[in-house]
Amino acid sequence: MTPQEFYQLLAQQGIELTDRQKDQFERYFELLVEWNEKINLTAITEKNEVYLKHFYDSIAPVLQGLIDNQELKLLDIGAGAGFPSLPMKIICPQLDVTIIDSLNKRINFLKLLAEELGLDKVHFYHGRAEDFAQDKAFRAQFDLVTARAVARMQILSELTIPYLKVGGKLLALKASNAPEELEEAKNALNLLFSKVQDNLSYALPNGDPRFITVVEKKKETPNKYPRKAGMPNKRPL
């Protein structure tokens, strides 16, 4: 997908990018490739592939009507090089985006990226999701949490649901749809007072299948969740 095809596809879906937004995506690509030489950010570095498999893929929640340009507080867990939240931030500048990542080198890249792209209302924190979720400044503070190919729902739910306000939503972006994954996660979702609201399936323009599972938080999360760092992974709920 060339940048031109990317713009055209978005325009067909009612999103006309300004010259500034096009420049932001272009600079994002350049910095991604440049920094990837120093720290491992992505295996995908060919321009057309980045536009398809990182940029277009990341804005799926916007294209699917799950997010629009309003002042929502969004947390991105395990964003790596800023996916999916920063491409969505370029398209929906009103979003207030927070990224937590366990690798300081990636946080340094994201800070520089946000500065270079002129993004405001973006916040980056170095640490573990399990630790920040017990901090009052973060717990139950967000309207949306996004996670792209981070972990199975059984684990992911414990890492993300505590951050949501009641009525807030987790958007889990995945490349495969395993019904058994949601079956496995039933107990975790019940313990965390949350419920699968939707499971959307769609395809990238090249035909690759993609899925977004939408989980809504129904009640406050019990204080004991999330458990200590590493526990959700070792002993899923």
Swiss-Prot record:
Disulfide bonds: none annotated. Gene3D superfamilies: Vaccinia Virus protein VP39. Pfam families: GidB (PF02527). Residues 218-237 are annotated as: Disordered. InterPro entries: rRNA_ssu_MeTfrase_G (IPR003682), SAM-dependent_MTases_sf (IPR029063). S-adenosyl-L-methionine binds at residues 78, 83, 129-130, 148. It is found in: Cytoplasm. Keywords: Cytoplasm, Methyltransferase, rRNA processing, S-adenosyl-L-methionine, Transferase. One of its GO terms (cellular component) is cytosol. One of its GO terms (molecular function) is rRNA (guanine-N7-)-methyltransferase activity. Its EC number is 2.1.1.-. PANTHER family: S-ADENOSYL-L-METHIONINE-DEPENDENT METHYLTRANSFERASES SUPERFAMILY PROTEIN. Specifically methylates the N7 position of a guanine in 16S rRNA. Belongs to the methyltransferase superfamily. RNA methyltransferase RsmG family. This is Ribosomal RNA small subunit methyltransferase G. It comes from Streptococcus sanguinis (strain SK36). The lineage of its organism: Bacteria, Bacillati, Bacillota, Bacilli, Lactobacillales. The gene is rsmG.
